């Protein structure tokens, strides 16, 4: 009986031993799994921190680029601003007719410089022969108040032994019907003013001539030289 009990005990002990070994193995595996999981969590946390830091670096780099672009703007941007400024300029273009065929930009600029501003000049030429067409366009950019009125007074002045004609054009401000009518009205008024000015100058010149003649006649009658008579008067 005792031998049988001992066998049972032995089997029980073997069973318990195997069970314990299994438990120990499962415990080790569990510890390994826990350790792996912790490592994975630590790795994820480190990746998240690096991802959070990356936008800050990128933002700092972006700010540096913005500062650089503000302090040193690209040439293209400056060019577009200059172009925009040019588009906002006020332009007044005069038509100049009855020009000789040997006209030049420089001599026309000198002729109109007396108005108070040097204009840009364009002299159209024939496409086939290359000869001048006998007229030009004189352009004033942002002219001062009295520049255009002075330039218009060069109408019928002499340029290279030619009496030139000057008129306002619709250039530089569009060619709408309202603007064209306005230009026509301005030209009409200006021509009327020119006619009155010429008549006034002719009248004044005639009066001065008559006055000189009267002085000369009086000098002859009195026996005194006309120049001396003017001084005495």
Curated annotation (Swiss-Prot):
Per the UniProt entry, what are the Gene Ontology biological process annotations, in alphabetical order?
A: eukaryotic translation initiation factor 4F complex assembly; formation of translation preinitiation complex; ribosomal small subunit biogenesis
Q: Which GO terms describe its cellular component?
A: nucleolus; nucleus
Q: Which SUPFAM superfamilies does this entry report, sorted A to Z?
A: RNA-binding domain, RBD
Name of one Pfam family that matches: RRM_1
> Bias category Basic and acidic residues: which stretches?
11-56, 194-216, 224-233
Cross-referenced Gene3D superfamilies: 3.30.70.330
**Residue segments, region Disordered:** 1-90, 194-233
- Comp. bias intervals (Basic residues): 1-10, 76-85
Write out the entry's keywords from A to Z: Nucleus, RNA-binding
Q: What is this protein called?
A: Uncharacterized RNA-binding protein C365.04c
Q: What's the source species for this entry?
A: Schizosaccharomyces pombe (strain 972 / ATCC 24843)
